[in-house]
Amino acid sequence: MCYNALMNKQEIYNYLKEQNIWHEVTEHKAVFTMEELAEVDIPYPEADAKNLFVCDDKKRNYYLITEKGDKRVDLKEFRKKNNTRPLRFASENDLMDILGLIPGAVTPLGILNDEERKVQVFLESEFLEGRKLIGVHPNENTATVWLKTEDLINIIKEHGNPVQVLEL
């Protein structure tokens, strides 16, 4: 894979602008955990997302699970509900090779780097309630981009990756 082709933060901003997608950006220090992000002054804390990049035990299927920042996903329960093989966190190498991301910067916008459309996205349905906003990293963990949840779903679908909205 040619890493020069991967979209970085500025390229994500340019893409959103070119697609006429409303977004708001909050620049902040690099954050690697939800606890660190809690120390940052963000405008829509209720819309902040936590992302888990997982694969099955055979590394045949990859999933990006996007949930509310204050929630926890039980991977065993998730597996049962979605009829997957046993799940585990994907390796740092897989994260870089497939999504072009480093740990701490996992985001649904990384799907734009998934050239083979390997990753299936699962999105928490609560992001479609209230303001219907979602806050995700722009492929780097030094900012949060706030988008309309429907726009994010459309970005993923238009790229060719499957996305399911469900209660996690």
Regions found by a protein language model. Give the residues of each.
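Extended, low-hydrophobicity, polar/charged segments
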Residues: 2-168
